[in-house]
From Swiss-Prot:
Gene3D superfamilies the record matches: 1.10.287.400, Argininosuccinate synthetase, chain A, domain 2 (3.90.1260.10), HUPs (3.40.50.620)
Name assigned to this protein: Argininosuccinate synthase
Keyword Amino-acid biosynthesis: yes
GO molecular function, one term: ATP binding
Length: 447
């Protein structure tokens, strides 16, 4: 069976991930007019820039959908976001600022929950608005087929007939008007935005050029912290975790995790926390650039890792970072539910996150400028009395340290011998002023 359909399957049911925007509206109307039977599915991901979710299915019905459903994905999205924090599943960082993989998390939830809803309705053909150059076309492909092995894919933006007729936003707008729908194009921004409750992605258009900065972006989850006219008073916030799960903000507990994430977004957003500018490698190995917002994810991540460093030993922390980066890349590639990702998630949640219990107090200022004011946990292995510089009882003596240093002579001697071995082969040069070989000064040698 052909998995990807290049042309519209006339007379068959097609499920379309319907956002209510111009692209999916025109695609739905066009498919109906050409003889397909479109079903519209809208994911409620708690997008901060969406004002009326209930109106979206109604519009889909007006444009010719056989049926239209609104699928509440918020609870599952927040659950996956918390899992990503517990595992440190983030691999794109620049200068210490992290991209929290909020779009990949959203695609994992959308791609599974919408296809599951389609399957309930007997719809086994899926279309969405992803383009052939991006990451989402592969993410949705993987998640869709994982959920429904019988799924076929039809994307209007891969259909030459659709492209020839409605290949641009201007053509789509004229098509909608000609069909009796007074659909006016929204004012074009200098970039495109995609968002969910966990974060927002700003990319493309002017942001494709590296001489365009965050200053052209209007945040939808925070504030322009770089603008001196925006007054942002400092704010103290306390985050409490129990067994790796965030349970309270400023002492307030929540009825569910969705409400907790919304409050974390409000707190972090007041300061512009979690904004970052990243150059990343897409799945197809081409580089792209995005500016990201994730105020709630950033707040929880900072507090989580503060507790992590005070509770776990160095080797465990090293494995957390290494496995977290590996898991983050799998998430980015649309492999969040693959066996290798599940293996990494299970080990990190079981052996790392389960011990993260405690409370962290921070002072938030402008953007990613913050201070940690206090860290409290019954699981802390940080014991200041062990290394105090003050006179008093100690868990080890000067003689103990002398013995420990003496044992180091073994590997120090081995290292010296290796350095001289490198010098003999020309990798290092001998120096009259030093007792050990040194790196060649390539500049002095004219290289």
């Amino acid at each position: 069976m052909t998995t990807i359909l290049k042309h519209l399957p006339v007379g068959q049911r097609i499920g379309i991930a319907f956002s209510g925007g111009l692209d999916t509206s025109a695609a739905l109307l066009w498919m109906r007019q050409k003889g397909a039977v479109p079903y519209a599915y809208t994911a409620n991901l708690g997008q901060p820039d969406e004002e009326d979710y209930d109106a979206i299915p109604r519009r889909a019905m007006e444009y010719g959908a056989e049926n239209a459903r609104l699928i509440d994905c918020r609870k599952q999205l927040v659950a996956e976001g918390i899992a990503a924090i517990q595992c440190g599943a983030f691999h794109n960082t620049t200068g210490g600022l992290t991209y929290f993989n909020t779009t990949p998390l959203g695609r994992a939830v959308t791609g599974t929950m919408l296809v599951a809803a389609m399957k309930e309705d007997g719809v086994n053909i899926w279309g969405d608005g992803s383009t052939y150059k991006g990451n989402d076309i592969e993410r949705f492909y993987r998640y869709g087929l994982l959920t429904n092995a019988e799924l076929q894919i039809y994307k209007p933006w891969l259909d030459t007939d659709f492209i020839d007729e409605l290949g641009g936003r201007h053509e789509m707008s004229e098509f909608m008007i000609a069909c009796g729908f007074d659909y006016k194009m929204s004012v074009e921004k200098a970039y495109s935005t995609d968002s969910n409750m966990l974060g927002a992605t700003h990319e493309a258009k002017d942001l494709e050029y590296l001489n365009s900065s965050v200053k052209i972006v209007n945040p939808i989850m925070g504030v322009k912290f770089w603008d001196e006219s925006v007054k942002i008073p400092a704010e103290e916030v306390t985050v409490r975790f129990e067994q790796g799960h965030p349970v309270a903000l400023n002492g307030k507990t929540f009825s569910d995790d969705v409400e907790m994430m919304l409050e974390a977004n409000r707190i972090g957003g007041r300061h512009g926390l979690g904004m970052s500018d990243q150059i990343e490698n897409r799945i197809i190995e081409a580089k792209s650039r995005g500016i990201y917002e994730a105020p709630g994810m950033a707040l929880l991540h900072i507090a989580y890792e503060r507790l992590l460093t005070g509770i776990h030993n160095e080797d465990t922390i090293e494995q957390y970072h290494a496995h977290g980066r590996q898991l983050g890349r799998l998430l980015y590639q649309g492999r969040w539910f693959d066996s290798q990702a599940l293996m990494l998630r299970d080990s990190l949640q079981r052996w790392v996150a389960s011990q993260i219990t405690g409370e962290v107090t921070l002072e938030l200022r402008h953007g990613n400028d913050y201070s940690i004011l206090n860290t409290v946990s019954e699981n802390l292995t940080y014991k200041p009395e062990r290394l105090t510089m003050e006179k008093g009882d100690s868990v080890f003596s000067p003689d103990d340290r002398i013995g420990q240093l003496t044992m180091r002579n073994l590997d120090i001697t081995d290292t010296r011998e290796k350095l001289f071995g490198y010098a003999k082969t020309g990798l290092l040069s001998s120096s009259a002023a030093s007792g050990v070989p040194q790196m060649e000064n390539l500049e002095n040698k004219g290289q």
